[in-house]
From Swiss-Prot:
UniProt function note: Component of the ubiquinol-cytochrome c oxidoreductase, a multisubunit transmembrane complex that is part of the mitochondrial electron transport chain which drives oxidative phosphorylation.
Pfam families xrefs: UCR_UQCRX_QCR9
Mitochondrial intermembrane side: 43-72
Organism annotation: Arabidopsis thaliana (Mouse-ear cress)
GO cellular component, one term: respiratory chain complex III
Keyword Nucleotide-binding annotated: no
Keywords on record: Electron transport, Membrane, Mitochondrion, Mitochondrion inner membrane, Respiratory chain, Transmembrane, Transmembrane helix, Transport
Cellular compartments annotated: Mitochondrion inner membrane
Family (UniProt): Belongs to the UQCR10/QCR9 family.
Subunit structure: Component of the ubiquinol-cytochrome c oxidoreductase (cytochrome b-c1 complex, complex III, CIII), a multisubunit enzyme composed of 10 subunits. The complex is composed of 3 respiratory subunits cytochrome b (MT-CYB), cytochrome c1 (CYC1-1 or CYC1-2) and Rieske protein (UCR1-1 or UCR1-2), 2 core protein subunits MPPalpha1 (or MPPalpha2) and MPPB, and 5 low-molecular weight protein subunits QCR7-1 (or QCR7-2), UCRQ-1 (or UCRQ-2), QCR9, UCRY and probably QCR6-1 (or QCR6-2).
Cited InterPro entries: QCR9, QCR9_sf
Name of this chain's protein: Cytochrome b-c1 complex subunit 9, mitochondrial
Membrane topology listed for this record: Single-pass membrane protein
Mitochondrial matrix topological domain residue ranges: 1-25
Length: 72
């Protein structure tokens, strides 16, 4: 009984191992792709958070900066 329960718990890890970690080339590709897409996701999230917290304080928000008054 105990062996069957233990074997069912390892199923997810065995599947992950067989899918990703069995061959070194697949494992390295998975790590590099994960790092690339993880960095992109963190960069996007931090950029959106920065923009949301600094609305009205950014260069793009100042409409008259660098413009000369029009003389009529």
């Amino acid at each position: 009984m105990e062996y069957a329960a233990r074997r069912n718990q390892k199923g997810a890890f065995e599947g992950f191992y067989k899918l990703i970690m069995r061959r070194n080339s697949v494992y390295v590709t998975f790590i590099i792709a994960g790092a690339f897409f993880g960095e992109r996701a963190v960069d996007y999230g931090v950029h959106k958070l920065w923009e949301r917290n600094n609305v009205g304080k950014r260069y793009e928000d100042i409409s008259v900066l660098g413009q000369r008054p029009v003389e009529e």
